[in-house]
Design a protein with these regions (language model features):
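Subset of outer-membrane beta-barrel
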Residues: 21-320
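Positively charged n-region of N-terminal signal peptides that target proteins for export
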Residues: 1-5, 111-113
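Sec/Tat signal peptide C-region and signal peptidase I cleavage site
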Residues: 15-20
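Sec-dependent N-terminal signal peptides
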Residues: 5-14
Length: 320
C-alpha cells in the first residue's frame, strides 16, 4: 500500500519523477560472482573461456510488487589482446519495467609482462526500453489519480559506456562512465533531468601468501556516483577463495553505504560460490538495515554460469 501511494504521488506530479529513473539500472552485487563485466566494460575478454552468466535478484522478499532483476551475459577473447561482450537484462520495479542490452569491445595492453602490469580499455553501446504500466495504478472502485494520464508510457534510449582498467600484480582498479550522452531536452518535460551519467570505480587487491598458496584473499570496493542528482554509494567487500587446480570455491561478505550517511550501512550480507569444471554457481543474501527492513525478509541473488571452449591466449594480458 505504501508503494502504491508513492506511485500515485508520482502520477499526480505529471510523471517526471518516475521517468527520471530510466537507464538508471539497480546496482546489485552480481558483479561479486566473478561477473565484473556487468559493471565494467574493460573486463570483456579477460579469461581463457567463453564465460556465460545467468543471474537473478529478488529484492525485499515479502514486499508486494518488490523489485526483481535478471541478466544474461557473456564475454570472450577476440584474438590475443581484445575482447567482446554482450549483456541482456530485464528489470521490474513495481509498475515500471526496463529491458535492454549492452554490446562491448575491449582491448588489453601489456606494460610489463614479467610483473603482470597491464592496462585495458573498453567501450559499450547501450540500448534501454523503459515502460510504465498505468493501468495497474487503478484499484477497483477508485478512479485513476490523474485523469489526464490516459495511456501507458514507454520510450527507448541509446547511449554509450567507456572504461579503463589498470592491473599490477594483485592490484586492480577500473573506472567507467556510463550513459555518457545527455537526453534530448525537446523530448521531455522541462523538469525532467537530462544528465544520466554514472561514474563507477571498482578497485581491490588479490593477496596470496605465496604463489603456490591455495588461499587467496580479495578485499575490494565499488563506488558509484550519479551526476544527475549527486547521489553516491559505496560497497565494501571481502572474498576468500580456495583453489583446487582449476576449480575453486569462495565465501565473502559485502556492506553497502550511502555516502552521505557514513558508518550507517544500507545493507549487509554474505555470499558464497564455486567453480567446478566448466560450471559456476554463486548465491548471495542481503539484509536491509533501513526502515524498510520491517516489511521484508531481505534480498536474494543467484548466479549460474558455464565456461566453454577452454583455450589459453597468446598474451598474459587476458589472463584472470
Amino acid at each position: 500500500m505504501m508503494k502504491k501511494l508513492a506511485l500515485y504521488i508520482c502520477v499526480l506530479m505529471g510523471m517526471p519523477s518516475v521517468f527520471g529513473q530510466e537507464l538508471q539500472l539497480p546496482t546489485g552485487n552480481q558483479y561479486l560472482a566473478d561477473s565484473e563485466f556487468l559493471i565494467m566494460p574493460t573486463y570483456a575478454g579477460i579469461g581463457n573461456n567463453v564465460r556465460v552468466r545467468l543471474s537473478a535478484t529478488s529484492q525485499w522478499v515479502g514486499f508486494k510488487e518488490a523489485p526483481d532483476y535478471q541478466s544474461l551475459s557473456g564475454d570472450m577473447r577476440l584474438g590475443n589482446r581484445s575482447g567482446l561482450g554482450l549483456s541482456l537484462y530485464n528489470d521490474r520495479n513495481g509498475y515500471t519495467k526496463q529491458m535492454g542490452a549492452k554490446a562491448t569491445f575491449s582491448h588489453h595492453l601489456t606494460l610489463d609482462s614479467y610483473d603482470s602490469h597491464f592496462v585495458s580499455f573498453g567501450i559499450s553501446y547501450l540500448v534501454n526500453a523503459f515502460r510504465i504500466d498505468i493501468d495497474k495504478f487503478t484499484e477497483a472502485g477508485r478512479p485513476r489519480a490523474d485523469a489526464a494520464v490516459t495511456d501507458n508510457r514507454a520510450m527507448i534510449n541509446h547511449n554509450f559506456e567507456v572504461g579503463v582498467l589498470y592491473r599490477y600484480k594483485g592490484i586492480f582498479a577500473s573506472l567507467a562512465a556510463t550513459n555518457i550522452l545527455n537526453k534530448n531536452k525537446e523530448m521531455f518535460d522541462v523538469k525532467e533531468p537530462t544528465t544520466l551519467r554514472n561514474y563507477n570505480l571498482y578497485a581491490g587487491y588479490r593477496y596470496k601468501r605465496t604463489p603456490s598458496s591455495i588461499l587467496e584473499i580479495e578485499p575490494s570496493v565499488f563506488v558509484q556516483y550519479r551526476e544527475g542528482d549527486s547521489r553516491s554509494l559505496t560497497d565494501a567487500n571481502v572474498k576468500f577463495r580456495w583453489f583446487d587446480f582449476e576449480d575453486y570455491y569462495w565465501v565473502g561478505a559485502t556492506a553497502r553505504f550511502v555516502n552521505d550517511q557514513a558508518f550507517k550501512p544500507l545493507s549487509v550480507g554474505p555470499m558464497l560460490g564455486l567453480k567446478k569444471g566448466v560450471f559456476y554457481f554463486a548465491y548471495g543474501y542481503n539484509l536491509n538495515l533501513n526502515t524498510i527492513r520491517s516489511y521484508n525478509s531481505g534480498s536474494h541473488m543467484i548466479t549460474l554460469g558455464i565456461d566453454m571452449f577452454q583455450g589459453i591466449g597468446g598474451c598474459n594480458c587476458t589472463e584472470r
